[in-house]
């Protein structure tokens, strides 16, 4: 079956990742020791997308866990599902990357990368027909960003025809963890533009807002944020794991969402978001789900889709519902908000339906949109980057690990190019495209 190999790196990646496994284990009825305790055959039908069945009938996640310090791994190991992972798949160093991208990418990370690749290879060989990789990491730190992007480029070399999907936590505008985040994030985006196929963009601030505003949590913890992320991650892949009427896989997703190869950074959303207490009292309808799913407040990254236009979007519904109703709602959204969709890609919203809803809900939906407004986020990081780089602040930490200033300049201009590409397609109209083709034709003559 079409397996997905999951890789988590750094503190953030390991925390999101372990939460994700809790959700997926729950959906497939697998207990913390890896035994199946579920009730429905559907849970087992495609369990091998994410799990390898060991000889004793236990299910072991196809997961590789890496970090440059042992701390987070220890807490994953002692966490609720810590015993389910294959012990050899924990790969960690002792030194830490100290929020330094260069340490993760060039020095400390480079020393550890071969051991990680060995584990990845071993897991990939266990697969019947590997579909691709999903990587969880943050871009603000050292390990997830530096070593994460190093691993992505190495995997790209070795498995060029497999999909590479990332769940990347971007530094958020107001909540800053370290002062060098803009450097780390810009250097990472430079890599992701070239080596990843699809990036799901998340950021803590947007997640805080959702917890605070929609879920009415007064003091949201990282656990709450990660819970939101894992709901989305599980939604993105539910089509692969459960039977449905309209299925999609990582590659179909990419084909439908990426009109130009570099523009593969997606906003994600999830519905229904209700506070934990009030969940059981209301029946959901497809129109309500659709309404909430397209709501700007529901997006998990700090960019406002109303400031740009959707190039493409994909909606994944879960639960028993009529496909006809889903299609009608989707057409309805596009007709009502036609100015927010580029007119030169007709029918640019794809929907899929999977029959099994997440635990505790009768239906749910996951939204993935390729919107030009995501440039706001790159712009923001880029401005912070430039402010520091102009003064060469903190650069010695990077050059000391053998990096060259040139690399910073390249990363900066790559990010700025990305922003202007988004802008170009935001402004493009169907007529302009035609004019442009005429010009080309004239030049060719």
UniProtKB/Swiss-Prot annotation:
The keyword Cytoplasm is annotated on this UniProt entry: yes
Name of the featured protein: Tubulin beta-5 chain
A Pfam family the protein falls into: Tubulin
Function: Tubulin is the major constituent of microtubules, a cylinder consisting of laterally associated linear protofilaments composed of alpha- and beta-tubulin heterodimers. Microtubules grow by the addition of GTP-tubulin dimers to the microtubule end, where a stabilizing cap forms. Below the cap, tubulin dimers are in GDP-bound state, owing to GTPase activity of alpha-tubulin.
Subunit structure: Dimer of alpha and beta chains. A typical microtubule is a hollow water-filled tube with an outer diameter of 25 nm and an inner diameter of 15 nM. Alpha-beta heterodimers associate head-to-tail to form protofilaments running lengthwise along the microtubule wall with the beta-tubulin subunit facing the microtubule plus end conferring a structural polarity. Microtubules usually have 13 protofilaments but different protofilament numbers can be found in some organisms and specialized cells.
GO molecular function: GTP binding; GTPase activity; metal ion binding; structural constituent of cytoskeleton
Source organism of the structure: Zea mays (Maize)
Gene that specifies this protein: TUBB5
Residues the record lists as binding GTP: 11, 69, 138, 142-144, 204, 226
Keyword line: Cytoplasm, Cytoskeleton, GTP-binding, Magnesium, Metal-binding, Microtubule, Nucleotide-binding
Gene Ontology, cellular component aspect: cytoplasm; microtubule
Co-factor(s): Mg(2+)
């Amino acid at each position: 079956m079409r397996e997905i190999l999951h890789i988590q790196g750094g503190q953030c990646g390991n925390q999101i990742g372990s939460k994700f496994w809790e959700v997926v284990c729950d959906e497939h009825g697998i207990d913390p020791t890896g035994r199946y305790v579920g009730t429905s055959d559907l849970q087992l039908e495609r369990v091998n997308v994410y799990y390898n069945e060991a000889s004793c009938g236990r299910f072991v996640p196809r997961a590789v866990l890496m970090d440059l310090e042992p701390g987070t791994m220890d807490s994953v190991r002692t966490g609720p599902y810590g015993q389910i992972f294959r012990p050899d798949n924990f790969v960690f160093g002792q030194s830490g990357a100290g929020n330094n991208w260069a340490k993760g990418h060039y020095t400390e990370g480079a020393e550890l990368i071969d051991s990680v690749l060995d584990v990845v290879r071993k897991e990939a060989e266990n697969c019947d027909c590997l579909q691709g990789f999903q990587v969880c990491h943050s871009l603000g730190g050292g390990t997830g960003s530096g070593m994460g992007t190093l691993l992505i480029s190495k995997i790209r070399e070795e498995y060029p025809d497999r999909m590479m999907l990332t769940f990347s936590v971007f530094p958020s505008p107001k909540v800053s963890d370290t002062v060098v985040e803009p450097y780390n994030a810009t250097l990472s985006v430079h890599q992701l533009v070239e080596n990843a196929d699809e990036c799901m963009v998340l950021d803590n601030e947007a997640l805080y807002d959702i917890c605070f505003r929609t879920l009415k949590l007064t003091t949201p913890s990282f656990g709450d944020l990660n819970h939101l992320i894992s709901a989305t991650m599980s939604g993105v892949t539910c089509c692969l794991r459960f039977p449905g009427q309209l299925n999609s896989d990582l590659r179909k997703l990419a084909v439908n969402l990426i009109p130009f190869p570099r523009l593969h950074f997606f906003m994600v959303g999830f519905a229904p978001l209700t506070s934990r207490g009030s969940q059981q009292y209301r029946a959901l309808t497809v129109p309500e789900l659709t309404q909430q799913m397209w709501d700007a407040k529901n997006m998990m990254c700090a960019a406002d889709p109303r400031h740009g236009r959707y190039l493409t979007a994909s909606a994944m519904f879960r639960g028993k519902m009529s496909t006809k109703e889903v299609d009608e709602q989707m057409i309805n959204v596009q007709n009502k908000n036609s100015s927010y969709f580029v007119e030169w890609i007709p029918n640019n919203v794809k929907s899929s339906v999977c029959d099994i809803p997440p635990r505790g809900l009768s239906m749910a939906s996951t939204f993935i949109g390729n919107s030009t407004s995501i440039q706001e986020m790159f712009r923001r990081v880029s401005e912070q980057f430039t402010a520091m780089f102009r003064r060469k602040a903190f650069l010695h930490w990077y050059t000391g690990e053998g990096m060259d200033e040139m690399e910073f300049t390249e990363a900066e201009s790559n990010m700025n190019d990305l922003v202007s590409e988004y802008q170009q397609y935001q402004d493009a109209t169907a007529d302009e495209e035609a004019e442009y083709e005429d010009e080309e034709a004239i030049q060719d003559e």
